[in-house]
């Protein structure tokens, strides 16, 4: 992939995508974004005047939209998905269509577009699920505990089995945090910081579970790195995205948030654990060794950025748009579900991967 090439970013107006689109444009790429703007278009508004950006309001579940967007494309970065365990449980039919059936459509369309040489797919470290006492690498046994995680596993398999003649790279993202043009306040570090600033304390439920944190700008940079890497280094490969030093328990994360706001005297309150089996401590040796990728942003630095944004009054923190779960509960899915052939088969694949 070279500057001047056309890159298709599905979900390019989202939390990660709005950073990635800016990075691609800054490096001289032409960028086509396919997004349904379920949460609005605030993530891209500042970029609309860039002549190398083309924005298509469309649906990854619509094969016509995918075919139209694939023309002249050298690489696809597939970010569009319904994200989050709780959000995906609201309607498993919607989740199946958006997260799995759309992946099947994408693979079909890419097979018809020989000029597409690279597909980079956004998966999640949540596929590791409940794995206590282990440091998990890309070859570790998966133990998903949510429909969202199972949908990611099935989609990984679809792309790698259906696109044998295309260079497919899978990125399993850690627990993302940090500021973004399309802001989210429903992610662990972001939520803790917002509550600390508004209420003077962080409440920790349990606290022993592990999470691998990674800043949203580092995630966007990882996608750019994977898209540009030589095929012999990345084709067919899976990379966990994050840094070893940013594996923290939930309790440690709360302490870091409080320590990053020293003048506010933030209290950390521990209460009984909730019914959440997820715990995964992840190795990021592979991405550092193969792609020379290391995160630039610590959790503390991310909290400081969040404070600057939230204290400035630029956001109404109670606006549902900053929480995928609350927004979808209030406004629904915007009629995105489609009745696609193979839906029952896809649901069976998800169930069997549990």
Predicted segments with their positions:
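Conserved Rossmann-fold NAD(P)-dependent oxidoreductase catalytic core, especially the SDR/UDP-sugar
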Residues: 78, 104-147
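N-terminal Rossmann/SDR dinucleotide-binding element
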Residues: 1-75
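C-terminal substrate-binding subdomain of Rossmann-fold SDR/epimerase-dehydratase oxidoreductases
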Residues: 200, 204-208, 212-354
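Glycine-rich NAD(P)-binding loop of the Rossmann-fold in SDR/ketoreductase-type enzymes
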Residues: 61, 94-105, 142, 146, ...
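Flexible, glycine-rich beta-alpha linker
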Residues: 128-129, 146-147, 171-187
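Short alpha-helix in the Rossmann-fold core of NAD(P)-dependent oxidoreductases
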Residues: 81, 91, 98-103, 120-123, ...
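NAD(P)H-binding glycine-rich loop region in Rossmannoid oxidoreductase-like domains
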Residues: 60-98
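Active-site Tyr-X1-5-Lys
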Residues: 130-132, 143-169, 197
């Amino acid at each position: 992939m070279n500057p001047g090439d056309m890159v298709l970013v599905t979900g390019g107006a989202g939390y990660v995508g709005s950073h990635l689109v800016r990075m691609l444009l800054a490096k001289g790429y032409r960028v086509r974004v396919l997004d349904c703007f379920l949460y609005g278009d605030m993530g891209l508004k500042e970029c609309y005047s860039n002549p190398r950006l083309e924005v298509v309001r469309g649906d990854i579940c619509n094969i016509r939209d995918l075919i139209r967007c694939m023309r002249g494309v050298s690489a696809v970065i597939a970010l569009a998905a319904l994200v989050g365990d709780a959000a995906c449980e609201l309607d498993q039919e919607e989740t199946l269509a958006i997260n799995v059936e759309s992946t099947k459509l994408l693979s079909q369309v890419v097979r018809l577009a020989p000029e597409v040489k690279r597909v980079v797919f956004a998966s999640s470290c949540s596929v590791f699920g409940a794995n206590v006492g282990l440091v998990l690498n890309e070859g570790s046994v998966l133990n998903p505990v949510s429909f969202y995680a199972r949908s990611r596993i099935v989609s990984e398999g679809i792309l790698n089995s259906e696109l044998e003649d295309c260079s497919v790279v899978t990125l399993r993202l850690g627990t993302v945090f940090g500021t973004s043009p399309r802001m989210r306040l429903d992610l662990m570090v972001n939520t803790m910081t917002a509550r600390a600033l508004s209420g003077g304390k962080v409440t920790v439920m349990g606290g022993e579970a592990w999470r691998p944190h990674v800043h949203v700008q580092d995630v966007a940079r990882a996608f750019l790195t994977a898209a540009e890497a030589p095929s012999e280094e990345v084709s067919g490969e899976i990379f966990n995205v994050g840094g070893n030093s940013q594996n923290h328990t939930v309790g440690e994360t709360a302490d870091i948030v409080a320590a990053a706001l020293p003048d506010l005297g933030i209290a950390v309150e521990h209460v009984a654990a909730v019914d959440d089996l997820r715990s995964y401590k992840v190795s990021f040796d592979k991405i550092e060794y193969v792609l020379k990728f290391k995160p630039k942003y610590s959790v503390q630095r991310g909290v400081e950025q969040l404070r600057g944004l939230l204290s400035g009054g630029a956001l109404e923190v109670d606006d549902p748009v900053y929480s995928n779960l609350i927004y979808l509960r209030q406004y629904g899915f915007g009629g995105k579900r489609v009745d696609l052939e193979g839906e029952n088969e896809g649901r069976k694949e998800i169930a069997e991967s549990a």
